[in-house]
């Protein structure tokens, strides 16, 4: 009887390649990709087929700055195309780094990056209330000019200038989801929905059309995890464990919580929208759709978390056994 393949999906932010203390030089990003590749290879060596979803916040921000600086010489691209460009560049760095790390361990496994369109609802309320800042800071004069000429929504960031804000709609379908699944089950490492994927809508003629928006990568990862039915969904973040009362004297780490407890803490405001909130919502959606287990931790503690010695696990109920996946 053939052994059932085990699928894992790991999601991490774009700051894994451009941390706050770095400029984002190409060599820096490549070195950071190599460090990330060591963790990816560790999961593969433990017997999992792997899907990778990464963020692109710093990268797409830098690309938009480049375009603004060159706007008088080269026509700028729209945000959906910029997302595709960063999917390609970041995918290449991760592909090369992971392939080389696998070769170091004599593992013959192909890595593939998919430029991934992700469907959003054109009637999503986010389109009426753009709130996600992207790109460079502008002077008040330039912001007014862009609002007038391009109909951009702009917000002031006290003391820093004005920034463009775009919608952040919820993903409802991954266009190439069966390609992602089939490649992963065929033994390929799949890098998909980088930056949350390229947001598209279905227009009045029934065709896909790109939109100026960004999709939260944790929501996109959760959607893939649900549709592909992965066995383990890993979300890397900046802290070892999810905490209650984060940053307060009564802060408390949570090693394990049920989906019901996670929803309760979320409703109580324990997990802010701009940080842990989307990760917890993504976890809840995955478990409620029949997912098995979520692991949330940081890169430094991932190996320990994979053997139940660190991190936070989110499960369906307390009766579920917590057994090391490795």
Sequence positions of predicted segments:
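C-terminal catalytic "cap/lid" subdomain
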Residues: 2-326
């Amino acid at each position: 009887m053939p052994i059932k393949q085990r699928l894992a999906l790991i999601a991490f932010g774009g700051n894994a390649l451009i941390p706050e203390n770095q400029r984002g030089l190409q060599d820096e990003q490549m070195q950071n990709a190599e460090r990330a590749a060591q963790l990816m290879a560790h999961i593969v060596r433990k017997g999992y087929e792997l899907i990778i979803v990464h963020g692109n916040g710093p990268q797409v921000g830098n690309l938009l700055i480049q375009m603004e600086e060159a706007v008088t010489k080269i026509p700028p691209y729209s945000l959906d195309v910029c997302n595709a460009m960063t999917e390609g560049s970041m995918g290449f760095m991760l592909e090369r780094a992971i392939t080389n790390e696998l070769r170091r361990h004599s593992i013959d496994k192909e890595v593939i990056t998919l430029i991934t369109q992700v469907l959003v609802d054109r009637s999503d309320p986010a389109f009426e209330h753009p709130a996600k800042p992207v790109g460079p800071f502008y002077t008040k004069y330039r912001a007014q000019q862009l609002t007038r000429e391009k109909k951009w929504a702009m917000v002031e960031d006290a003391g820093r200038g004005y920034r463009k804000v775009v919608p952040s709609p919820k993903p409802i379908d991954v266009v190439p989801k069966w390609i992602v699944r089939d490649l992963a089950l065929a033994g390929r490492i799949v890098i998909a929905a980088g930056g949350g994927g390229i947001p598209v809508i279905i227009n009045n003629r029934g065709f896909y059309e790109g939109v100026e928006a960004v999709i939260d990568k944790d929501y996109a990862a959760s959607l893939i995890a649900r549709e592909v039915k992965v066995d383990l969904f890993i979300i890397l973040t900046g802290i070892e464990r999810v905490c209650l009362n984060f940053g307060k004297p009564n802060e408390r780490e949570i090693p394990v919580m049920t989906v019901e407890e996670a929803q309760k803490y979320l409703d109580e405001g324990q997990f802010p929208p701009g940080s842990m909130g989307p990760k917890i919502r993504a976890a809840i959606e995955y478990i409620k759709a029949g997912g098995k287990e979520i692991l949330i931790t940081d890169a430094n503690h991932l190996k320990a978390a994979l053997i139940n010695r660190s991190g936070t696990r989110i499960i369906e109920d307390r009766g579920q056994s917590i057994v090391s996946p490795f």
